[in-house]
C-alpha cells in the first residue's frame, strides 16, 4: 500500500523517477526525485511525499504545499514557494534552514548551500558534506563523527562543542572557523586544509588520545594531518 491506495505493480514507478508532468491524483510519492530547475506551475502538492527531493532552482510559487513531507529535500536561493509557506522550518535543507537537532545522519548533502542555516545540536554523523557551503553556520553541539567535509567552505563556521571524531576535513577552507571548544577531534583528518594557521598550535595541544588516533579511511592520524599544514619555518 502507498498511502491508502492499493499498489498496482503494472503502473508503479520508482519514486525517484517521477517527473512533475506525471503527477495526477492523490498520494503523490516523489521521494528522491530530481526536480531541480523545474517550473511546477500550479500543481497540487498537498500531503505529497517529497522527502529527499532536489528542489534547487525549482519554481513552486503557485503550488499548494500544505502538509507536504519535505524532510531532507534540497533547496537553494533560487527555489521559490508560495507566499506564506514556511520553507525554512519544513525540514528541507538549504540556505537559512532551521535544522536545530535535526536527524541528518548519513545524509547526502554534497555541494549543498547551508549559509545562514542553523544546525545547533544536529545529528550529522556519517553525513556527506563534501563541497558544501557552511560559511558562518553554527554547528555548536552537533554530532559530526565520521562526517565527510572534503573541500567544504567552512569560513567562520562555529563548531562550538561539536564532536568531530574521524571527520574528514581534507581540503576544507577553515578560515576563521571556531574549533577551540570542540568536544573531540579524535581521528579527524585536516590534510590540505586552508585557513588553520593560527589554530594549529592550539589543536596540537589536545590530548594524545585524540591526536594519535588512526583514521582507517585516510590512513593517518590527526597529529600527522595537522603537522603537515605547518610551514617549514614553524
Please give the residue ranges for each predicted region.
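Tandem repeat scaffolds
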Residues: 3-234
